[in-house]
Regions:
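Noncatalytic alpha-helical scaffold of FAD-dependent oxidoreductases
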Residues: 1-178
Length: 178
């Protein structure tokens, strides 16, 4: 018997969620003959808003406001200034040489991705919402942003740490509860 599942209606008339039932059976109940995936294109543009030299409390406030804003951020991190704090190496002159990052000190980085027009507008909205002075920010263009987030992903900023490093991925809505 051929059964079609998915699309607008996920459940069949019996009330069973066929997708979960099929996945849970590890192929013992059915043979899949046709599978359709929804694939989203890679973002056209990605920029990172860097906010320089703020206290931890202010950085957490920026992160909280940006995550809960309507600007649809795709990444956020606070990197402290002092290597005594979590063993973070934040001498930006030596660690990350790009034309927009020439300052020492702690930084908060917020990534926004999407279409070029949308990204620029959302960055401006975020700057206005957070009430940041322009002399305290840098904006990394797409290629710079990719390099920065690759360094974050590989924990390169923490390479001299003597502490244990734990990388966790959590839903943005749970960040406030940490």
């Amino acid at each position: 018997e051929i059964i079609k599942s998915g699309g607008v209606v996920v459940k069949n008339v019996t009330g069973y969620d066929l997708s979960k039932l099929i996945c849970g059976s590890y192929g013992t109940l059915v043979a899949l003959t046709e599978i359709t995936f929804k694939v989203l294109p890679a973002p056209e543009e990605g920029k990172t808003l860097i906010i320089h030299n703020q206290r931890v409390e202010l950085a957490l406030d920026f992160l909280d406001k940006s995550i809960s804003s309507s600007n649809d951020i795709s990444g956020a991190i606070f990197l402290p200034e002092d290597s005594k704090v979590a063993g973070c190496v934040m001498n930006i002159e030596n660690t990350f040489k790009l034309n927009d990052l020439k300052r020492d000190g702690s930084i908060t980085a917020i990534r926004i991705e999407g279409s070029k027009k949308s990204v620029n507008q959302r960055i401006e909205n975020l700057i206005n919402e957070l009430k940041i002075k322009n002399n305290n920010i840098s904006i990394l263009e797409t290629y710079q942003s990719e390099i920065f987030w690759n360094k974050v992903k590989s924990l390169e900023f923490f390479y001299k740490s003597k502490n244990s490093i734990l990388r966790t991925v959590i839903p943005p809505s749970e960040c406030v509860n940490l």
